[in-house]
Design a protein with these regions (language model features):
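Catalytic beta-strand/loop cores that center a nucleophilic Ser/Cys/Thr
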Residues: 82
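Glycine-/acidic-rich phosphate or pyrophosphate-binding loops and their flanking alpha/beta elements
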Residues: 85-102
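Short, flexible loop motifs at catalytic/binding sites
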Residues: 1-78, 97-281
């Protein structure tokens, strides 16, 4: 309002670092005639001599160079766990329209937050391919909300992969979230094995080479995977050996549970712990 009242202007100048809020502003400006947007790549402007650019590429590496000099929002950000793999997914055209195949069951993989976001991936296993057809994320709502979302999507579900701590009973109700989900019709379930986070990350890396993503329905989940990164120690100026917890954690964790918790008969994934809970009242 302060700008509008005075017929003022706002200028946003920045360097890409994945498709974050700066990307959202830039993307919106491209389709709004009241905005002006421009991208000035070093290779286009001719301001810097070629030998200087070549030296920068050798020193910085391809991804950082693409961000800093070529204004790339697609380049892997520093410390990203899946930067290389997601770049390959993009370059090979595996982010596209991926329709639901009614002849194949849908597997969901959940990251259940307590007072935090809950994320769900929807996958179909067709031959060696893992097709991510949908993604959903929300916060501040109960489990009944997610059960309703699954019902409204009208997919035929084969299994629901849940984290191992879903079996812990809550103090307030004396029931586990597993029991609550079962009462809401979320069955059968697969309990993902309890593994080290690094092992799960490696499982996702191995799986991403076979993944296809629906560009529209999985957009936020795709960006979560692209930007999921190591925690950075600002004081020591080093990467810590653990993930940074932010908005990307939810989608990345749900993908990790999918990678370690479900085995398609045609795949080489490890055996899951499966429990059919139809008998729980």
């Amino acid at each position: 309002p302060a700008i509008a009242d005075r017929q003022g202007r706002a200028t946003f100048i920045g360097t890409p670092k994945g498709k974050n809020e700066f990307w959202e502003i830039f993307d919106a400006s491209r389709n709004d005639p009241t905005w002006y947007s421009a991208v000035h790549k070093a290779s286009d402007t001719g301001i810097l001599p070629g030998d200087e650019l070549d030296a920068a590429l050798k020193t910085m590496g391809e991804d950082r160079y693409e961000q800093e000099f070529e204004c790339s929002f697609e380049a892997a950000i520093a410390g990203a766990y899946y930067g290389t793999e997601m770049k390959e997914v993009t370059n090979t055209g595996r982010i596209a329209a991926v329709p639901y195949d009614r002849a194949v069951g849908v597997v969901t993989a959940w990251d259940l937050g307590i007072g935090d976001s809950t994320s769900i991936w929807f996958a179909q296993h067709v031959g060696a391919e893992v097709r991510l057809i949908d993604y959903y994320e929300s916060s501040g709502v109960g489990l009944d909300h997610y059960a309703k979302v699954l019902q409204e999507k009208d997919y035929v579900y084969e299994s629901h992969v849940l984290p191992h701590d879903v079996q812990v009973k809550e103090l307030g109700t004396g029931k586990s979230r597993l029991e609550t989900l079962d009462s809401l019709g979320i069955r059968p379930v697969t309990i993902a094995p309890k593994l080290m986070v690094d092992d799960g990350i490696q499982a996702v890396r191995s799986m991403l080479g076979r993944c296809w993503f629906d560009e529209t329905k999985c957009n936020r989940g795709i960006e979560a995977l692209r930007q999921y990164q190591r925690d950075f120690d600002e004081k020591g100026r080093t990467w810590r050996g653990r993930p940074r917890h932010d908005w990307t954690s939810h989608g990345a964790d749900a993908m990790r549970y999918l990678a370690v918790g479900y085995q398609n008969q045609a795949s080489s994934w490890g055996d899951p712990i499966r429990r059919n809970l139809r008998g729980i009242a």
